């Protein structure tokens, strides 16, 4: 299994993501609101930077990419619903079904700062440039315990206590950071997936303690109900309650592959979606124990 140790950015840390690097020639994905593209073709043409189940239409999966936000159905067909821009740090509001948050880059270059959508991703506005911004949050999470609290990483770990209007630096952030997830129990508890393992902070990111050591962890996700998911390389997808006391392995057999992004249907937690380092989108109807390619019938 190959792990590329470069800058603390998900697409550069993970060898599988680097293998699907996007060229300038691939920039114009030929789709608009009236056209569709198969997700298997979409993942060959762009990076996936985040997933979320559409809370107002749970049959749809929102896919944040290097070239815009797409909405995909169970048939595996996707359509772009936003303008063309690079969405990073994509995360849904934990309780408001219309709100989404992100960062990244506009098509013409530069940084977007902290941006929000109140129409399920169709239009976006900048809420704040962030601290020392405009920021480009590659990792971002909204606290399920207090949605006014948002964490993002740009030249350190930043925190907002007013839904992204103002930001302060909480600390340098963990070494080799890949992903962040806020706790459902406390706004000051934060989980970090890193090259060295899974970490937890109970003081809003000022200090960290290990939960999993000795293997890279490529994602961490916490549901509003308090179920923690993580992907441990060499082990597989694991889950635990909060606070985590032992991690249950719920699926393995990924070989040299691993999961990069995870989305759980808040209305039906058995429905789970994932993006792999090999550029595949997967779906599960048994809480991640078995998987099929998005667009294919579940067993």
What are these regions (language model features)?
Residues 2-299:
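Extracellular glycan-interacting surfaces
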């Amino acid at each position: 299994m190959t792990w590329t140790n470069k800058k603390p950015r998900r697409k550069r840390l993970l060898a599988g993501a680097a293998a699907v690097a996007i060229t300038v020639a691939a920039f114009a994905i030929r789709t608009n609101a009236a056209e569709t593209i198969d997700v298997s073709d979409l993942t060959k043409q762009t990076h996936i930077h985040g997933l979320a189940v559409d809370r107002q239409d749970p049959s749809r999966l929102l896919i944040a990419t290097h070239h815009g936000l797409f909405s995909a159905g169970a048939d595996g067909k996707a359509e772009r619903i936003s303008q063309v821009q690079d969405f990073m740090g994509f995360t849904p509001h934990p309780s408001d079904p219309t709100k989404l948050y992100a960062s990244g880059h506009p098509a013409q270059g530069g940084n977007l700062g902290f941006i929000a959508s109140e129409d399920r991703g169709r239009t976006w506005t900048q809420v704040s440039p962030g601290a020392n911004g405009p920021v480009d949050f590659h990792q971002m999470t909204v606290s399920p315990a207090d949605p006014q609290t948002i964490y993002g990483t740009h030249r350190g770990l930043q925190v907002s206590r007013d839904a992204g209007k103002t930001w302060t630096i909480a600390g340098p952030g963990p070494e080799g950071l890949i992903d962040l997830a806020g706790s459902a129990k406390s706004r000051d508890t934060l989980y970090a997936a890193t090259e060295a393992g899974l970490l937890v902070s109970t003081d809003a990111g000022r200090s960290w303690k290990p939960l999993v050591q000795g293997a890279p962890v490529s994602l961490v996700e916490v549901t509003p109900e308090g179920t923690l998911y993580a992907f441990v390389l060499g082990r597989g997808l694991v889950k635990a309650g909060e606070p985590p006391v032992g991690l249950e392995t719920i699926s393995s057999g990924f070989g040299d592959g691993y999961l990069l992004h995870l989305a759980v249907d808040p209305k039906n937690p058995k429905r789970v979606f994932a993006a792999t380092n090999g550029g595949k989108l997967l779906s599960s109807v048994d809480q991640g124990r078995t998987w099929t390619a998005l667009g294919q019938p579940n067993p």
